[in-house]
Amino acid sequence: MANLPNTSHEDTVGTTGHEWDGIRELNNPLPKWWLYVFYATVLFSVVWAVLYPSVPGLRSYFGGTLGYSQRDAVALSLQQAADSQAVYRTKIRDAAVEQVKADPELYQFSVSGGRVVFAENCAGCHQSGGIGTKGYPSLADDDWLWGGTLADIERTLRFGIRSGHEEARVSQMPRFLADGILKQKEIEAVADYVVALSEQKPGNPQAAAIYKDNCAICHGDAGKGNRELGAPNLTDKIWIYGGDRNTLVHTIAQSRNGVMPAWSGRLDDATIKMLAVYVHSLGGGE
């Protein structure tokens, strides 16, 4: 240690005059450019605090000499967006949904706007792109419980399914086991028969008889369903809750009665029509 060379820059830099146990502190000030930048940022922050909202108080805050407000800016931006869309939305509101689809300009506007509305209000259940998930039907295929025309989709959106609205779509599947209509063995036989229907195979004649007496009135003798009643097609292997035997047994025994909200009153007429056009465009529209 004693033989190490002296590398001190004391002769060229100088010290601050402080010394601790023989250790001296060299005086190396910050570069001037760094100091100038620092002073500029301090000055900028002071000017900013004077011009814009900055210092909070107990009940309010200093609003700045410019009177700027982010809330007002957002409100203005939203109003400007609404004003720019007003011409299209008025036309959509006053037209039938079929006319909206027939007009290329309105159709493109509706698909673009409907996509945003769908993401905000519908994708939570039906998933992005309307692909659906267990308990929530796909909107991208050609299998519809209540019909897939523009008018059908608009009505479903407007009034919902079992939503409590006086014009809602309503159907009621019995709880065949819970209500004592069928016994467990009979329900299992019907489930096997439904599996056979979905696979386009002949089912057990005894199970077919039980199906005909209890299920055909809604689903049809051939299991093709009935859109007037919201009864699904049982022959296309498209299932909302699942098509395996155990799931079918549970569905028959305890029933399924999902609910879709009525969007009338939550969304305006133009938005509902835009949403109907978007859903129709997903691939399964009729």
Feature-to-residue mapping (PLM):
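Short, flexible micro-motifs
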Residues: 25, 48, 117, 133-135, ...
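Periplasmic c-type cytochrome electron-transfer domains
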Residues: 2-105, 146-156, 171-194, 264-280
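Secondary-structure transition/capping residues
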Residues: 57, 125, 164, 168, ...
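Extracytoplasmic electron-transfer domains, predominantly the class I c-type cytochrome c fold
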Residues: 134, 140-196, 226-284
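Sequence/structural segment immediately N-terminal to covalent heme-attachment motifs in c-type
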Residues: 106-131, 145-149, 154-159, 199-225, ...
